[in-house]
């Protein structure tokens, strides 16, 4: 994998930095594992904007990813690595010994021809999935479940990982990349290693149009709007003379946004500032 800086042949190419991976499959994806992906434009079923700055973008097929990894005791061969337009990580197409194919998130250093497996007592090596009760303390894992059998929810983006730092009773203690330390049931599954394509963070799109291809619309400052559109709008100059707020008048800059009190007991330490 190489990080390539483009030559400044035009203003749109001057600042572009690409991540080139020669190991990725150059053909079409595995069609039975594709499904339709409908664009919402950030609107809900009533047509109201629920997420700003979303709209347009290139058409995409969604790859059905196996986040549960529940085919225990059946070894799988890595047929190929593929690009996935719906996420920052690359995906790997597995061919199981019973003939079934599934997509998984491609861990770091996984290559075409490698073999992976899932189960209670599989080998401790990158790409294998097993319950966290059987993973050694200090190991680095990704694709972590929050509830047994629900499927992975933590550490799924490119280059992300979680470290197991303790085990007590039915729970293991994890340290997340954000600095948060939380407890999760030891029957939850995780995949050994970290997610590949860590160089994703080094890429530079270089122009506004590249954002639009990805379905991301411009973010307009509140001070550039009219008073009817934003609390910061209007007035002479750029000073809005009040505490920063959202377009709906809710305080920003440090206001707590977490409402899920049900799982507060699972968090041992809040995320720390970097």
Swiss-Prot record:
Classification via SMART domains: Ribosomal_L2, Ribosomal_L2_C
- UniProt keyword list: Ribonucleoprotein, Ribosomal protein, RNA-binding, rRNA-binding
Source superkingdom: Bacteria
Enumerate the Gene Ontology biological process terms: cytoplasmic translation
Give the residue ranges for region: Disordered: 221-274
Tell me if Transmembrane is a UniProt keyword of this record: no
Q: Specify whether DNA-binding is a keyword of the entry.
A: no
Write out the function statement from the record: One of the primary rRNA binding proteins. Required for association of the 30S and 50S subunits to form the 70S ribosome, for tRNA binding and peptide bond formation. It has been suggested to have peptidyltransferase activity; this is somewhat controversial. Makes several contacts with the 16S rRNA in the 70S ribosome.
Q: Which family does it belong to?
A: Belongs to the universal ribosomal protein uL2 family.
- Give the quaternary structure: Part of the 50S ribosomal subunit. Forms a bridge to the 30S subunit in the 70S ribosome.
Q: What is this protein called?
A: Large ribosomal subunit protein uL2
Native source organism of the sequence: Hamiltonella defensa subsp. Acyrthosiphon pisum (strain 5AT)
- Name the gene: rplB
